[in-house]
Amino acid sequence: MSGKTFLVMAGGTGGHVYPALASALALREQGANVVWLGARGGMEERIIGRTDIPMRLITIGGLRGKGVAALLMAPVNLVRALWQAFSVFRKEKPDCVLGMGGFASGPGGIVACLTGTPLVIHEQNAIAGMTNRWLARGARYVLEAFPQTFAQAQSVVTVGNPVRDELAALPSPQERGIGARKPTLLILGGSRGALALNEAAPKAIAALPETLRPRVVHQAGEGKDQTCRELYASLGVEAEVYDFLQDMASVYANADLALCRAGALTLAELCTVGLGALLAPYPHAVDDHQTANARHLEQAGAAKIFQQDNLTVERLAETLTSLLGQPQKLLDMANAARTLAKPEATREVVKYCWEACAND
């Protein structure tokens, strides 16, 4: 299998970049040459720039919410991006292209179709993004994290979302002691933080009876940790507040319940480790895909959903009181989450990339 070159396209958010990076590293472990195609100025430029994966950048951005001038320039910008992507293809000569979302995936996927290069796409969310909806028609394989995301497409396989191997290696919820120890509430606002969670969570925890208050580990987001820490202190609540949590395997291993947004990568991690959650979908996500993501966990009994408009201190405190007072319920939710896990997702993505080459 060695000697093949794979062009991995992903960017824009961690939900696209990190699953793609896991797949890229797995491909390299199997002897492949990997090149990354990203958008200039995107977060992928910083994240992949810290690795030794060669990166090629094109100039492309989104149109949602932009003004008239941006819409008028869109055809010109698309042609430029297509030409830049074509130049990358001509130089790198990829044997297969893996598109995992983000702005660069559009031009790169189009060039793959035009040049006859096998294309594999992967959609992380329960509602497919615009780029992947377009590219599904020309893809050799369409991979989805959630069932029925591409109900009408051909060659669709539900594989889950790639996550880090160390998370899949964690013991089961029961072996970790969920339901049999003082609970730890893990609050994740994402790397940039979620203001609604940072404000509501401390007040809700303060409203709990002293005997039910959990240990609190709170990721408040870059530049938001000090304000959040001061709020907890003013309410008389002990909490470990961080801007960003690094060793997530250890963090998850010691958590009994999560309070977080409903991004695809976060939910994949919750299911992989087996951790119940209170989910507050980001209300401005494109096509409200976070709510769709969250529904899968809710239907399995692994989560409860709080829409932004009903994320009140009173309702959150009431739910926390109910769950923290029923240790068995925490264990049941954690076990339900783990039934949704797809620990082989990375290997499945890589397998279909190799198959796309073999069938060329």
From Swiss-Prot:
InterPro entries named among the record's database cross-references: GlcNAc_MurG, Glyco_trans_28_C, GlycoTrans_28_N
Compartment list: Cell inner membrane
Catalytic activity from the UniProt record: di-trans,octa-cis-undecaprenyl diphospho-N-acetyl-alpha-D-muramoyl-L-alanyl-D-glutamyl-meso-2,6-diaminopimeloyl-D-alanyl-D-alanine + UDP-N-acetyl-alpha-D-glucosamine = di-trans,octa-cis-undecaprenyl diphospho-[N-acetyl-alpha-D-glucosaminyl-(1->4)]-N-acetyl-alpha-D-muramoyl-L-alanyl-D-glutamyl-meso-2,6-diaminopimeloyl-D-alanyl-D-alanine + UDP + H(+)
A family per Pfam: Glyco_transf_28
Entry's Gene Ontology molecular function annotations: UDP-N-acetyl-D-glucosamine:N-acetylmuramoyl-L-alanyl-D-glutamyl-meso-2,6-diaminopimelyl-D-alanyl-D-alanine-diphosphoundecaprenol 4-beta-N-acetylglucosaminlytransferase activity; undecaprenyldiphospho-muramoylpentapeptide beta-N-acetylglucosaminyltransferase activity
BP GO annotations: carbohydrate metabolic process; cell division; cell wall organization; lipid glycosylation; peptidoglycan biosynthetic process; regulation of cell shape
UniProt keyword terms in alphabetical order: Cell cycle, Cell division, Cell inner membrane, Cell membrane, Cell shape, Cell wall biogenesis/degradation, Glycosyltransferase, Membrane, Peptidoglycan synthesis, Transferase
Residues the entry annotates as binding UDP-N-acetyl-alpha-D-glucosamine: 13-15, 125, 164, 191, 290
Membrane topology qualifier: Peripheral membrane protein
Annotated signal sequence range: none
Pathway: Cell wall biogenesis; peptidoglycan biosynthesis
Class of enzymatic activity (EC top level): transferase
One GO term describing the cellular component: plasma membrane
EC number: 2.4.1.227
Protein family according to the UniProt entry: Belongs to the glycosyltransferase 28 family. MurG subfamily.
Matching PANTHER family: GLYCOSYLTRANSFERASE, UDP-N-ACETYLGLUCOSAMINE--N-ACETYLMURAMYL-(PENTAPEPTIDE) PYROPHOSPHORYL-UNDECAPRENOL N-ACETYLGLUCOSAMINE TRANSFERASE 1
Protein purpose: Cell wall formation. Catalyzes the transfer of a GlcNAc subunit on undecaprenyl-pyrophosphoryl-MurNAc-pentapeptide (lipid intermediate I) to form undecaprenyl-pyrophosphoryl-MurNAc-(pentapeptide)GlcNAc (lipid intermediate II).
Protein name as annotated: UDP-N-acetylglucosamine--N-acetylmuramyl-(pentapeptide) pyrophosphoryl-undecaprenol N-acetylglucosamine transferase
Taxon lineage: Bacteria, Pseudomonadati, Pseudomonadota, Gammaproteobacteria, Oceanospirillales
